[in-house]
Amino acid sequence: MARSIDPAPRAVRGFVPARTDEERFLMRHVEDLARAAEGRGIARYSGFLSDREQDLARAALNRADVPESDHHFEGGWPGAERKLLCLEPEGCYPASPLCCVKLTCRTLSGAALPGHKDYLGSLMGLELRREALGDIVLPADTPGTAYVFALETAGELICRELLQVGRTEVTTTLLSLDEVPEFPQA
């Protein structure tokens, strides 16, 4: 009986199998971003990723042998759920495409304030893709105010086009990440 002298293949730590074609596409896209960042020595960024997509991205980076020092996930604030994958090889100039838009409601006292669904619905009404939008934070200490983390291009579009959320008029202010207040952890 013939026997192989090769040792049994080792399991790859951190492997997460893709379940759908979209997930397989995401993993290939992350590998392509990693190759481009490493090959050209320039920073590359993904769109905003959900928790599952972040796990798949980590698995793809693991499979592509990208060192942990060359990538991180950034959501704009410490408690962020939706985050960008930032591939920043050593020696590159990082220029994160992340920004924050402050939305302030202009309502009469006693009027109902919009909720998270209202904000998300209004942003989707601008025909923005979900990958362009990160977390929407509604701080409890400042009712009528929301902070939307987004890609720079989406943030600029929000500032130009968003006039109301639900039936409530809003004013928009584009903030740098340094200007974002600290939010209490939920």
Residue ranges with predicted function:
Residues A2-A186:
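Non-catalytic terminal extensions of ATP-dependent helicases
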